Amino acid sequence: VEVDAHGRRVHVIVVHLGLIPGSRVRQVDRLQQFIEREVPPGSPVVVAGDFNDWGAQIKRMLSGFGLYEFDAPRAFTYPARLPLVQLDHVYVRGLEPLGLHVPRGRIWWRMSDHLPLIAEFKL
C-alpha cells in the first residue's frame, strides 16, 4: 500500500513468512522482485510483519537489497504472554528510524500469539 505521509509517498508492505526455511527464502526472493517492479528506486519502503526467522538469514537477504532493521535492542514479541524471541521485525529503506515499542499487557496477548510492534520514523 502507498501511504501519504506529510505529502511524501511511503510504500508499506506487510508479510507473514512461512515456517520452512526454504519457503522463506523463496518468499523473500519474490518480495525483492515485487519491490523492484512496483516501488520506484529511492522511494521510502517499510516491510513489517512476522518473518518467522530464528536466525539471521532473512536479515542478510533483505539488507542485500537495501532494507535495514532498527539498530536498537531486540524487541521480543513471541510468544505474547511471555515474549522470549523476536520473530516480528520492521525493515526500512529511505526512512530514519526513531523508535520501536512493544506494548505489553493482557489486552495485547489476548489478541494474538504475537505482540505488536509500533515503529516511528522520520521522513
Predicted regions and their residues:
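Active-site regions of metal-assisted phosphoester/phosphodiester hydrolases
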Residues: 1-123
